C-alpha cells in the first residue's frame, strides 16, 4: 500500500518514552492511505504498526480515492486518539474526515 512513496509525517511522544509517527503511504500517484510507526527515540528504528494502513479509502464515499494529511491529537482525558485527515473522491472533490481510536494503545 506504500510502494510508490511515503511522506507527510507527524510525530508525537508517547507516555512510555517511545514516539509514534503518522504518515501518508502512496500505492500510486492518486491513491493514498495513512499509516503509523513506532520508534524508541523518535529518530531511528521505526517499526510499522501491524494494523497498517490505519486509514484507507472507502468505496463510494467522500474519501474513495485517497486519505492523506493526517493531523492527530492524543486525548488522555477521554482515553482516545483523534485523527483528522483530508479525503478525496475524484468525482466529488475534497473533504475533511475524522477517525476516533478508542483507547491510548495503538499496537
Feature locations, PLM:
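Carbohydrate-active catalytic/glycan-binding domains of CAZyme proteins
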Residues: 1-107
Amino acid at each position: 500500500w506504500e510502494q510508490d512513496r511515503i511522506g507527510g509525517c507527524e510525530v508525537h511522544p508517547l507516555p512510555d518514552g517511545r514516539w509514534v509517527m503518522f504518515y501518508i503511504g502512496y500505492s500510486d500517484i492518486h491513491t493514498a492511505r495513512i499509516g503509523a510507526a513506532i520508534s524508541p527515540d523518535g529518530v531511528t528504528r521505526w517499526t510499522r504498526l501491524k494494523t497498517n494502513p490505519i486509514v484507507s479509502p472507502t468505496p463510494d464515499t467522500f474519501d474513495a480515492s485517497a486519505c492523506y494529511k493526517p493531523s492527530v491529537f492524543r486525548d488522555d482525558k477521554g482515553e482516545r486518539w483523534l485523527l483528522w485527515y483530508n479525503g478525496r473522491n475524484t468525482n466529488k472533490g475534497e473533504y475533511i474526515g475524522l477517525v476516533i481510536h478508542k483507547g491510548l494503545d495503538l499496537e
